[in-house]
Amino acid sequence: MDLISVLPSTSKSCVCMHKPLSSSTHKLKPFCRTIRILGMPRPRKSVLMASSMSMSVNTLVSDDDIQRRTGGYHSNLWNDDVIQFLSTPYGELAYRERGERLIDEVRDIFSSMSLEDGEFSDLIQRLWMVDNVERLGIDRHFKNEIKSALDYVYSYWSEKGIGCGTKSIITNLNSTALGFRTLPLHGYPVSADVLKHFRNQIGQFVSCPSETEEDIRSMVNLYRASLIAFPGEEVMEEAESFSEKYLKETLQKIPDCSLSREIGDVLEHGWHTNLPRFEARNYIDVFGQDTKNMESNRKTEKLLELAKLEFNIFQSIQKTELESLLRWWNDSGSPQITFTRHRHVEYYTLASCIAFEPQHSGFRLGFAKACHIITVLDDMYDLFGTVEELKLFTAAIKRWDPSATDCLPQYMKGIYMMVYNTVNEMSAEAQKAQGRDTLNYARQAWEVYLDSYMQEAKWIATGYLPTFEEYLENGKVSSGHRVSALQPMLTMDIPFPPHILKEVDFPSNLNDLACAILRLRGDTRCYQEDRARGEETSCISCYMIDNPGATEEDALNHLNVMISGVIKELNWELLKPDSSVPISSKKINFDITRAFHYGYKYRDGYSVSSVETKSLVMRTLLEPVPL
């Protein structure tokens, strides 16, 4: 039966009594970059509501004569046939055995570096190997070799940087920039002041007039390094501005080649929207087209073959996981929820692009399921449900008992059970990985999340516009970042004891910043479409009310500056030295932020997933790399 075909009126006598797990409000701490709230009266109704509601809004009248709004989203792009008929031969034993042999051969290449590389190139060669195995997506096999190589490089690091080799007389920008980018990501403390030594007498970066390939690559690595900036590092901002301008001008001069494509990819995706598996797919093409690399010794041939094979072998794992996800989607009754977006395959793809180690199946599937649930709830609270129905649903979730569905309208019953069953199942998976029961902890997160939705539903129903600060504090919770990350993260083979979890999850600054980025970036991409659907409240509208006379362009500029600053703070939270939390424990939450950020890079890629998001699915999930 279609879940929205029967919508009986809610009985006034039915009351879902509940006891929340915690009396705490779980209010996120104030965000450090909120604007000054002006001392002016707040309008209770939006002055733009009448005009925005007159725009195209999809509505339907249910069987109980309730007028309901829907988003008019496009349908699911990946039906059962697309998934079920995926075929790949790369799951066969012969390919895996070939991969194991290649791994051993690449290990031999790492080992031979100390013998083959001269003292005038030993540093850059080690950095080259580390950088390439990471960009090709095969670094998980060489953790010990990478550490040994970086230990060696760091032992020669100075306040002025490094040269190409240990016997080099002068420091080298390419070696220093590549080292400066790579070392912090592995926990080695280095100062941005090292880049000051590559400026001229008046404190400006300068380019070499010869513009050789090495000069250009120096600028590529300087730009890549500049993106891992911390707050207050002016030299990093200068390096980014200078190298970005240089590379854009270079693209206009050089012919189409592997180097030009590499520059284009780096400028297009940077770091914070360059998902590791997506980067690997793009870099495989760049690496394979580089004639200089292919004329080199066996290093490049082995690296490239292993990267291609690993990429395709993982697709055989993805096929099995997609079949499992499709069964869950059907069994949960999702196809009958016709008012919502169905983007479970897209969410799975994002998870696969940030965690493609085979053992992290639980994370990938959990993330896709959690995000699908969040999307259903988002559309139900923002559009389809009435305020009274949503109050009943929120109360029923806090009871956490299937009998609570007796109080709910018919269309909500299946949604409730999808949430209930999936959260319980993910908690069981997390208990296996973490060795303790985390269900109550997860329930608290979902309760707070729905409370934030309930607040927004009331704002929409009344037309009330909150202050910017009020909206952002609630919006960081309703962004869904925390509940999308928490349980999938706990299924991984990374220990998250309570003292570590509190530094990664709520109430940590890492969590607060990640949620802020998702809310701010999401609003800059979605506010016009949301307003057309009658959802007036956004960071943009609240900023404009707080600042009379400000235009939408002013608001967008302000938010973009905020986002840039928050990204730098997030970099610091991930990489700050002397942290009690390993980078590996923080990295998955950081990478989830990158995944969401990618989805909003060009547009709302979750509502309109038929362009860039579809391309991501095709390129990383469905299309193998030609060997």
Swiss-Prot record:
**Top-level class of the enzyme under EC nomenclature:** lyase
One BP term from GO: diterpenoid biosynthetic process
Q: Name one GO molecular function term.
A: magnesium ion binding
Pathway connected to this protein: Terpene metabolism; oleoresin biosynthesis; Secondary metabolite biosynthesis; terpenoid biosynthesis
Where is Mg(2+) 2 annotated to bind?
Answer: D378, D382
- Cite the InterPro entries for this sequence: Isoprenoid_synthase_dom_sf, Terpene_cyclase-like_1_C, Terpene_cyclase_plant_C1, Terpene_synth_N, Terpene_synth_N_sf, Terpene_synthase-like, Terpene_synthase_metal-bd, Terpenoid_cyclase/PrenylTrfase
Tell me the function of this protein.
Monoterpene synthase (TPS) involved in the biosynthesis of monoterpene natural products included in conifer oleoresin secretions and volatile emissions; these compounds contribute to biotic and abiotic stress defense against herbivores and pathogens.
- What family is this protein classified in? Belongs to the terpene synthase family. Tpsd subfamily.
Name of the protein this chain belongs to = Monoterpene synthase like 1, chloroplastic
Origin organism of this chain? Answer: Pinus contorta (Shore pine)
Task: State the organism's lineage.
Answer: Eukaryota, Viridiplantae, Streptophyta, Embryophyta, Tracheophyta
Which gene codes for it? Answer: TPS-mono1
